[in-house]
Amino acid sequence: MRRRRRFAFALPLVIVVALVLALGVSTGSARSHRQTDAFKAAWIYVGPHDDHGWSQAHDKGRLYVQNALGSKVQTTYKELVPEGPQTCQVIESLVRDGNKIIFATSFGFQNCMVTEAKKHSDVFFEQATGTAQAKNLAEYFGAAEDAIYLSGMAAGAATKKGVLGYVVPFAIPEVIRHANAFALGAQVTHPGAKVRLIWTNSWLDPSKEKKAAQSLVAAGSDVLGQNVDSPATGQFAESKGVPWVGYDSDAHTFAPKQWLTAAVYNWGPYYLRRVKAAMDGTWKTGFYYGSLKDGFVGLARYGPKVTAKTKRMIAAKKAALLSGKFYEFAGPLHDQKGKLRVKKGQRLTVKQLYAMNWLVKGVIGSAKG
């Protein structure tokens, strides 16, 4: 059954997403212990909890909390929640149900999180990839750009033409810095490599992602990467014999021959700390930015096409990142048009990364989407 479900993934998901968008409703689900005295914690996902990507990585974090705390906590999730005003309705429902901490896992949920945090001072709110804080609203993310840079090295080592394709969702700073990191990593193992972008304007749309992958290969890309949520790019890559770098989760089963690696997140330990803090009264607002050092981000397993030499190069670069001797966004760095964006000796701060609106030299595409 599991094998059949994997290969049937793309079409049903397209149908479900289309229905959700057309009807203007969100799909809710829960997996929890039902003790009435248990502390209640909730997660909101933009995709299905089993998307084999972003939302599934968060749901693994939720399960980590549930398994660690057992009957002391009741965890709930809402999936396929549209970004926009409807998010507020979902949050209101979760508050009415007695949830005392709510994790919103997509940038487009932020406006409603800010609104609802003001209305419910007795509830703790946590916004992933966000830019807003309040007394009862915290933000959290991690330096995925470091892991993406390393995955880009694997991609660069796999290309023969020196042209890689990268399927990207929205032209926002988060995605732009990730695309830049991927390109800079690829240029280490394949100097002069070009990375061509195609924007889908959706976090999760397998049909658009597959079409983007097809277009990238047709335009000459011989390696594919992604910053979107489904494994559709990888399924296409496997069918065409094109090496593939995933994102968010280990999805090697969708492309066992062409899989290289992926930047992945380990949300569980952070979620556990925050739920415990909410339970014992020590929760405080703030900004958390996880790293390679604390294990929040990392690389998934390598596929068969990644050579021992490439693995050694990636390991050495990872060690340099961990020690602080290397940083991918240290100057000099030039943009697509040759303009110096980061001077020699300068290192971009997290604040500057959060405002990044330009693409590095070698990236083909527009930073405006």
Named regions from a protein language model:
Residues 1-39, 367-369:
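Short, low-complexity disordered leader/linker segments with a strong preference
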Residues 31-369:
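A residue-level marker of the well-folded mature domains of exported/periplasmic proteins
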